[in-house]
């Protein structure tokens, strides 16, 4: 039977409390009653009045247009991503299966579930514009009898909006950093309120990795020492060794530049979306890293792998060589490294076989993290980091 129809009803104040605990709000989402929320600016207001803007774009939130053109098209054309979801869904969807998707976007994954014969599919999307387009896509595929789109945040979703508790919870709300779009928090919220113990969560597992790398190409665009006989090193005072930057924002694909991994991958955390919670990831963790090669660790490279059954979806540069869309939607992330907290950054130099202690600090919502090399003691042993942490 098709899902019950509901108008977009007045928000419960408890919805606000739920949403305010989650760090990421998707582009174009409508959250007028959430604390600190500002209505999205219309695209036409960002364009010089002498430049013509098509009517289809004029009043659309600028953040949504930027997001769709920045990564949504690439995401929908990532064949390996699409096949990952289709193959996992194929193992779990039957004519008796009810499917709930959160962060539905274009509705593609919900359409997959319907195509595979799900009894009903409810697609939840926080952006009014995307929800409308998802409905159009569903109508274009003659699946409106199976798939219903609800314009609301998943934190606003109630059991009354669903025909029954879903058999499958489906989502693809990962960022360049695996939890960069608060994927765990959104899944946990729905899991705690709306799922039954037997609900299959797709995908189920995910692991965030980091690895120190030597990369001359990155070094040349993120630092300076001088030109000919001119000393310019004081410009390094402003080098950002705190922020995590997406590789594509540097204008590079990591698999198209030469770099060396100076250690084995560091498993920062592992998540089981069917049981893990935010607090399962400590706010601070230490990692002993053994150098497998000597060299200068210019940066920490971040990537993730999501798995379900035998299927894997990965942003490791080795796994995206032939997947340009994957690198344009997610790619990898980088954090430049500093061996000290001095007036100028100090290179992190690795010696093969030597042990290095790194500290990883997470933001309260676990969306943001930072890697820091702990200094050596006088006897050559690594010590606890002394940088500012909370």
UniProtKB/Swiss-Prot annotation:
Cellular component (GO) terms are: cytoplasm; protein-containing complex
Listed under subunit, the entry gives: Present in large multiprotein complexes.
Q: Which gene encodes it?
A: PRMT7
Major site of localization recorded for this protein: cytoplasm
Q: Where is the composition biased (Basic residues)?
A: 1-11
Species for this entry: Trypanosoma brucei brucei (strain 927/4 GUTat10.1)
Name the catalytic site residues: 172, 181
The entry's family comment says:
Belongs to the class I-like SAM-binding methyltransferase superfamily. Protein arginine N-methyltransferase family. PRMT7 subfamily.
Question: What's its EC?
Answer: 2.1.1.-
Q: Name one Pfam family in it.
A: PrmA
Q: Any keyword S-adenosyl-L-methionine? A: yes
Q: Which residues form the SAM-dependent MTase PRMT-type domain?
A: 55-372
User: Where do the segments described as Disordered lie?
Assistant: 1-20
In the record, biological process GO terms are:
chromatin remodeling; peptidyl-arginine methylation; peptidyl-arginine N-methylation; regulation of DNA-templated transcription
Do you know which CDD domains this protein is assigned to?
A: AdoMet_MTases
For whether the record's keyword set contains Hydrolase, the answer is no
Keyword list, A-Z: Cytoplasm, Methyltransferase, S-adenosyl-L-methionine, Transferase
User: Where, per UniProt, does this protein localize?
Assistant: Cytoplasm
Q: What does this protein do?
A: Arginine methyltransferase that specifically catalyzes the formation of omega-N monomethylarginine (MMA). Has activity toward multiple substrates in vitro. Able to mediate the arginine methylation of histones and myelin basic protein (MBP) in vitro; the relevance of such results is however unclear in vivo.
What is the name attached to this protein's record? Protein arginine N-methyltransferase 7
Upper taxonomic lineage: Eukaryota, Discoba, Euglenozoa, Kinetoplastea, Metakinetoplastina
What does the record give under GO molecular function? arginine N-methyltransferase activity; histone arginine N-methyltransferase activity; histone methyltransferase activity; identical protein binding; protein-arginine N-methyltransferase activity; protein-arginine omega-N monomethyltransferase activity
């Amino acid at each position: 039977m098709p899902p019950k129809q509901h108008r977009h009803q007045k928000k419960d104040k408890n919805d606000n409390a739920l949403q305010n605990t989650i760090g990421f709000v998707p582009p174009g989402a409508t959250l007028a009653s959430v604390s600190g929320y500002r209505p999205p600016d219309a695209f036409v207001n960002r364009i010089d009045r002498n430049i013509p803007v098509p009517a289809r774009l004029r009043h659309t939130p600028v953040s949504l247009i930027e997001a769709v053109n920045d990564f949504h098209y690439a995401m929908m054309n990532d064949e390996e991503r699409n096949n990952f979801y289709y193959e996992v869904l194929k193992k779990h969807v039957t004519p008796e299966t009810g499917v709930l998707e959160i962060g539905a976007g274009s509705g593609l994954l919900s359409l997959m579930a319907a195509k595979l014969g799900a009894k009903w599919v409810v697609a939840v999307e926080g952006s009014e514009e995307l929800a409308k387009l998802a409905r159009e896509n569903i109508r274009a595929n003659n699946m409106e009898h199976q798939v219903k789109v609800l314009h609301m945040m998943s934190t606003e979703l109630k059991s009354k909006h669903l025909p029954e508790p879903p058999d499958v919870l489906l989502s693809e709300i990962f960022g360049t950093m695996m939890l960069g779009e608060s994927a765990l928090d959104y899944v946990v919220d729905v899991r705690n309120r709306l799922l039954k113990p037997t609900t299959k969560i797709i995908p189920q597992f995910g692991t965030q990795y980091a690895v120190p790398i030597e990369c001359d190409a990155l070094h040349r665009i993120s630092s300076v020492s001088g030109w000919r006989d001119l000393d310019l090193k004081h410009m390094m005072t402003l080098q950002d060794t705190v922020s995590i930057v997406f590789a594509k924002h540097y204008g590079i694909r990591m698999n198209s530049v030469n770099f060396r991994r100076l250690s084995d991958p560091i498993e920062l955390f592992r998540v089981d979306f069917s049981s893990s919670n935010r607090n399962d990831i400590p706010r601070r963790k230490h990692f002993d890293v053994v150098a497998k090669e000597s060299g200068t660790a210019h940066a920490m490279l971040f990537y993730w792998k999501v798995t379900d059954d035998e299927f894997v979806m990965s942003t490791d540069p080795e796994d995206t060589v032939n997947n340009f869309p994957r690198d344009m939607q997610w790619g990898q992330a980088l954090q430049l490294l500093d061996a000290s907290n001095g007036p100028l950054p100090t290179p992190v130099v690795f010696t093969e076989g030597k042990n290095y202690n790194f500290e990883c600090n997470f933001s309260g919502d676990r969306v943001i993290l930072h890697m820091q090399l702990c200094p050596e003691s006088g006897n050559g042993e690594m010590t606890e980091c002394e940088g500012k942490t909370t």
